[in-house]
Amino acid sequence: VQSSPAARDRHQETIPSAEDRDTVAEETATTVITVTEENRRIRMKVELKDKERIDDLQRNGYQIIQNPEKFCFGMDAVLLTGFAHAREKDILLDLGTGTGIIPLLMEAKYHCSHLTGLEIQEESADMARRSVALNDLQDRIDIVTGDIKEADQIFPAASFDCITCNPPYMIGQHGLTNPEEPKAIARHEVLCTLEDVVSRTAKLLKPGGHFYMVHRPFRLAEIMTMLVKYKLEPKRMQLVYPYIDKEPNMVLIEAVRGGKPRMTVEKPLIVYQSPGVYMPEIYDICLLYTSPSPRD
C-alpha cells in the first residue's frame, strides 16, 4: 500500500520557529493538559511521545503536535489554507494530511461542516488524531489512515465540496539515500504521483467542487495539462516569491470540477521583505483565520 503525506518539513522558508511561538516541548513521553480560558474549554488529555512537542497555531487557540525530527509543517501549508476558500456547509478532504495542519487551519478559518484528512504514514496520522483530540475537534475532523491511490475506494464518489492537497513536489527518487524516510516521502513522489492526486480528486469532488493545491512552478505546465485531462478546470493561480527579487518557489492553484475555461492569475505573493521579516500580506493571511470570508 503506497501514498504520501502533504504536511512536511521541507528545505524552504518555514513559519516562525518554535522558539518564536508558545511551544511546549517534551523529551520523553508525558501527559499534557492545557486550559484555554479564551475558548472556555479544557483540552483533552493527550500523550506526547519521544521528541514530540506542542506548538501554538495562534488560530482560535488551536495547537498541533509535531516531531521536529520527522514531521513539521512549513509555509506552503499555511499559504495554501490562506489561498483556499470554503463555506460552513462544505465537506472537505485533505489528501496526504501529514500531521493534520491543513484540516486544523481550515476548520479555524471556515468552521466547515466536516473535514477529513487522509494520510498513509501511521505515525503522522497518529499525531494528527492526537492534535484533533487536543483541540476537542473529534466531532468535526476525522483522520483516516490510507493510500491516496486508493482514496476513491475509501470514500464515496463525488462526496466532497472541497479538496486540498500539499503533495510531494519532486519527481521520483533521484538523489535519495533512504526513500522510506518520512521526509523523503513527503518531498518526493516515492509513494504517489501528481496524476494519482489529480485523478482521485476528480473522482471524489462533487460537480462544481473546488480543488486547491500548492506545488512548484517548474511543474506548472504538467500540472495544468493534468488538471484539464481530468476535467478539473484551472480557475485561479498565484505565484509565491520568497523575496521580491527572487524567482518564485511555490504556486497556488484552484481548479473546479467541470468548470468553464477561464483562469484568473492573481498578483504575486511575496513572503519576506527582509530576512526574518514578513511582508504585510503574509500577516493579512494569518488574520484570515479569525475573520472568515466564505466563498460565493
What is each PLM-predicted segment?
Residues Q66, T145-G146, H215, Q238:
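Short loop/edge segments at beta-strand edges and connector loops
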Residues F83-C165, M170-L176:
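Conserved SAM/SAH cofactor-binding pocket of Class I
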Residues P167-D196:
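Mobile active-site "lid"/loop adjacent to the S-adenosyl-L-methionine
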Residues L191-Y241, P248:
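Conserved Class I SAM-dependent methyltransferase catalytic core
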Residues V1, A6-E38:
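Periodic low-complexity repeat segments enriched in small/acidic residues
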Residues K45-R87:
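Class I SAM-dependent transferase core
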Residues E233-V277:
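Class I S-adenosyl-L-methionine
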Residues Y289-D296:
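Conserved small/polar residues in nucleotide/adenosyl-binding loops
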